[in-house]
Amino acid sequence: MKQSKLIKKITTTLDKLKIPYSLNVFYRDCLSPLGYPLLWKLKLTWRGSVVLVEERYHDTSRAPNPQRLQQVNAIKDDYALSHKIPLLLIWDTDSSLISPEWLSRQLDLVITQDF
């Protein structure tokens, strides 16, 4: 399974932080512009909370099937809300900006949101 540079950087950072995580990929028919499976990629436990981490693209027209992408994103958002699981969205982020401090701050922010 291919990973984007972004997800690879996040998993490397989680390893540095010694945070347990599992990489989960669903809906393999929906691919990113670079050909790796899209949708939520990362499930981790942060300070006692399960968090889903997902990357999204501003330009969904570059995806092979934009309608399918929108449909799947809606399913995923519903899942996160109905299961009360925080969803950390990372939009087209430059992976070089991701540091352990940046990631832990983002995770802290997402788990304090009111579900």
Give the location of each predicted region.
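Nucleic-acid endo/exonuclease domains
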Residues: M1-F115
